[in-house]
Regions:
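Alpha-to-beta junction loops
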Residues: 81-92, 106-108
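Short helix-initiation/N-cap motifs at beta->coil->alpha
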Residues: 69-76
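Mature, Sec-exported extracytoplasmic domains of Gram-positive
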Residues: 31-34, 45-48, 73, 113
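Short, polar/charged alpha-helical segment
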Residues: 26, 43-64
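Short, low-complexity disordered leader/linker segments with a strong preference
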Residues: 1-36, 59
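Short, well-ordered beta-strand elements
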Residues: 32-43, 63-68, 89, 144
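Hinge/lid segment of periplasmic solute-binding proteins
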Residues: 24-30, 97-147
Length: 147
């Protein structure tokens, strides 16, 4: 369920922002009653802007978004992952930290469909995929996100 939820959320946020998709036009799964936890570094004005995107997502999908912004995100995400209580999504401000978390099995790959979507829909798609691809705990390259 979580991999599907990650993919739905990432896909929706990316596509809706890129294309101007309205909440009424959303055709993905109904996520009513589910909560999506997101951790990131955004505070004050940046958090307010992100909250607007989250409100849009909530309206379209029926899910509730629980965003926790922190000026110590880099430390907190490591603690949360190692404790086994990570958020559903994390907005990493630096790819190196995301790569470190992937290497210990702390991230869930987005899969080939999302990787191909980014390659085909971003002007420098392959570069974005490269930036979000890291070895997993077994040393296999996986696509975890885009920046």
């Amino acid at each position: 369920m979580y991999k599907t939820l990650y993919t739905v959320l990432v896909s929706f946020l990316t596509i809706s922002v890129a294309t101007g998709l309205t909440a009424a036009e959303y055709k993905g799964p109904n996520l009513s009653g589910q909560t999506v936890s997101i951790a990131g570094p955004w505070l004050t004005g940046d958090e307010e802007n992100f909250d607007k995107v989250n409100a849009y997502f909530e309206k379209a999908t029926g899910a509730k978004v629980d965003y926790a912004g922190s000026d110590s995100f880099e430390q907190q995400i490591v603690i949360d992952i190692k404790a086994g209580s990570p958020p559903n999504l994390a907005a990493f401000p630096q790819p190196g930290l995301a790569a470190n978390m992937a290497a210990i099995g702390g991230l869930v790959p987005l899969g080939n469909d999302m990787e191909n979507w980014v390659k085909n829909n971003y002007a420098a798609g392959p570069s974005w995929v490269d930036l979000g691809t890291y070895p997993d705990k077994n040393g296999n390259d996986q696509f975890y996100g885009f920046f």
